[in-house]
Structure formats: C-alpha cells, structure tokens
C-alpha cells in the first residue's frame, strides 16, 4: 500500500486553479521529487498535504486514512513532518534546543511544562535531550549543539532543521526546497543527508529547483505546470521527456 495517495486534488483561489486534478502516490522508502517553475503549484500542493490549506476537492490519504481538512498538528502526530524554503530557527535557542522543540511532539509532559522545568518532567526531558543530541550526531553537526542556532552557517542551519523534523519521528518528510540558498558544496551535503535519512526508513517527498540534486537523489519525479501534472516518471525518463525539457530544463 502506498504511504501517501493524492487523488484528483484541486485547489481554487477565486478563478485561479492553483492545483488542478493532481494525482500521484508515494511508496514507502522512496525519495520522490516535485518540480516545476514558479507558479506551478508546488507550494500550494505541500500546503494541501500538510494541512495548511484545505482542498477544494479531491482526497489525500496517509497510511490509508484520509487527512484532507485536518489541522497541521493532527497530521504531524500521524507521522508527517515538513521543512520550509525559508529556514525557521528559534532565536535565543541553541541548535540542540531547536531540535528538542521538534521532539516535544512525542513527549507526554507538554512543551510549556518542560520549558518551566517542572521536576516531574525531568526524566522525559533528559530522554528528549539525548534523542535530539543523537540526531545532531547522525547529521554530523553535534559539535554545533550548544551554538546559538541563528549564528550557524546556512548549510548548518539546514541540517539543524532536518534534525528537528526527524525528532518528530516521521514516516514521511516533506522538504520544501532544501537546497535554497546553499552553495554547490552545501547542496551536495544536503543531498547526502537526505539519502541517509531515506536509508534510515523515512520516506521523502521534496520540492526543489536544483535539477542536479533532484536527478541525483530522486527515485521518481512529478512535474507540475500551471497546477497540472504533466509528467511522472523515473529521473532518466524525465530527462528525455521533450515537453519537460522544453518547459522546465531548457533545450
């Protein structure tokens, strides 16, 4: 059974069909990419999947259950985590503390009680701290754990953001332009981290403009144009698709 099923998804803004009859599936263990130029509907699609927007029609099934119309936190608890194009670090917090925020969704004490350091939260807080530190080690940025997150290099902040998303223990990770703002070396490193995340059993769906990264790490690619799906295939086939080459990749 597919982990994520998108069926005839449609979202209108007045007379604009931002997402128009889009269908595809994401299988467990895949890295699947969604590409297209600005205005293609990629961000709107992610907002529909993660609960930030409600579709005008169509269905989204996650683990076999329909989730369209549910609140983002309800979808997150079910196992879907998301990162954003613009990195959102909590100012005044270290890299480790930023990751711990993501981990609190798995806790029972509640974020506020933990922030107030209530004694009965201490055992759980230690477990959250240990797990968050392990994620920083996994993504090879443990040496930055106690550094203010906003002072880190852009590529390091992206890794912290990935660790924070993984702290939620998702089965599906939505990555919104993970290479945005990164140089060629940082982009290659992010690609390596995404592949490592997939190898750990987390399915990945990403939106990305960097075609080299997409072609290198994706198992399948969905191509959008003005809100409609115009292609879905293996990277090698997408590279040979004449319509995709003409509209998106350049001849």
What feature does the model see in each segment?
Residues 1-251:
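Glycine-rich phosphate-binding loops of nucleotide-dependent enzymes
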């Amino acid at each position: 059974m597919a982990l994520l099923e998108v069926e005839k998804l449609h979202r209108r803004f007045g007379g604009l069909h931002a997402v128009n009859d889009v269908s595809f599936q994401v299988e467990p263990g895949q890295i699947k990419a969604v590409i297209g130029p600005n205005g293609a509907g990629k961000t709107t699609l992610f907002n529909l999947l993660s609960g930030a927007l409600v579709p005008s029609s169509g269905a989204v099934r996650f683990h076999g259950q329909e989730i369209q119309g549910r609140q983002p936190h309800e979808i997150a608890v079910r196992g879907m985590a998301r990162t954003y194009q613009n990195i959102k670090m909590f100012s005044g917090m270290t890299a480790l503390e930023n990751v711990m925020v993501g981990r609190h969704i798995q806790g029972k004490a509640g974020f506020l009680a933990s922030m107030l350091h209530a004694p009965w939260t201490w055992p759980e807080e230690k477990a959250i701290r240990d797990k968050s530190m392990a994620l920083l080690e996994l993504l090879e940025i443990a040496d930055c754990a106690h550094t203010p997150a906003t002072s880190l290099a852009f590529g390091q902040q992206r890794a912290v953001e990935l660790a924070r998303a993984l702290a939620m223990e998702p089965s599906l990770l939505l990555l919104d332009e993970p290479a945005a703002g990164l140089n060629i070396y940082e982009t290659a490193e992010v690609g390596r981290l995404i592949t490592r995340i997939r190898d750990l059993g987390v399915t990945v769906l990403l939106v990305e403009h960097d075609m080299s990264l997409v072609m290198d790490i994706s198992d399948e690619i969905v191509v959008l144009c003005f809100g409609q799906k115009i292609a879905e295939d293996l990277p090698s086939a997408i590279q040979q698709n004449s319509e995709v080459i003409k509209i998106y990749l350049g001849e």
